């Protein structure tokens, strides 16, 4: 029986990823201000999705802007093991809330790649859109639509304080031609699909 290589988390690589992401929207007091579907969020999504691609993950974006980065397993018909969080922040957010959940998932994939391991099930690292609800309400919008807590149509009615709809924000942040995610496959905005 062949032995399985030991997985080694590269804490410096994870830390460097966290610190690079924290630079986008960094405040002078050490926090981060990166509201959902803004220019800063677009830059953050571009950075993280670049790392996803570098790790060999295939990207899909649903209609509310959630990102699903998939590493196939030996049996792609099996349901994926999913992890992730969000990269938007509160107006005076920290460097780790949400970001760590996404980047820890990416680090797991990187470690599996480094060890040359193929999992039986696919792995998906998710970025949920507008989880903090600082720009659009309700909170947990992306994951809520995906999980069926409320409809896509309901979420698409959301407007920020300037009157911009979440649909316009998704088009700007996700589907802009200058955005590296513009070539992503689209996915339904529901776990049921």
Predicted regions and their residues:
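Active-site-adjacent substrate-binding region
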Residues: 15, 23-27, 165-193
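Acidic/His- and Gly-rich active-site-bordering loop/insert found
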Residues: 8-93
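Short acidic, glycine/serine/threonine-rich loops at helix termini
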Residues: 94-96, 134-141
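Short coil/turn connectors at secondary-structure junctions
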Residues: 55, 76-81, 118-123, 188-191
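Flexible loop/turn segments at secondary-structure boundaries
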Residues: 68, 132-135
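Basic/polar N-terminal segments that are highly enriched at the extreme N-terminus
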Residues: 1-9
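Alpha-helical metal-binding/catalytic segments enriched in His/Glu/Asp
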Residues: 21, 83, 93-131
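A glycine-rich helix N-cap at a beta->alpha junction
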Residues: 123-124, 138, 142-169
């Amino acid at each position: 029986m062949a032995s399985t290589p030991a997985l080694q988390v590269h804490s410096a690589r994870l830390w460097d990823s966290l610190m690079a992401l924290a630079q986008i929207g960094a405040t002078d007091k050490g926090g981060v201000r990166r509201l959902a579907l803004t220019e800063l969020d677009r830059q953050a999504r571009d950075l993280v999705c670049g790392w996803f691609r570098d790790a060999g993950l295939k990207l899909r974006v649903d209609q509310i802007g959630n990102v699903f980065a998939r590493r196939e397993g030996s049996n792609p018909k099996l349901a994926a093991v999913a992890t992730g969080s969000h990269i938007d922040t509160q107006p005076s957010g920290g460097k780790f809330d949400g970001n760590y959940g996404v980047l820890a998932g990416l680090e797991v994939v990187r470690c599996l790649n480094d060890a040359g391991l193929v999992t039986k099930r696919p792995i998906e690292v998710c970025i949920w859109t507008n989880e903090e609800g600082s720009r659009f309400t309700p909170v947990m919008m992306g994951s809520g639509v995906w999980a069926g807590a409320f409809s896509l149509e309901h979420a698409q009615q959301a407007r920020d304080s300037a009157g911009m709809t979440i649909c316009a924000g998704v088009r700007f942040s996700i589907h802009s031609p200058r955005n590296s995610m513009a070539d992503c496959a689209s996915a339904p905005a529901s776990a049921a699909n």
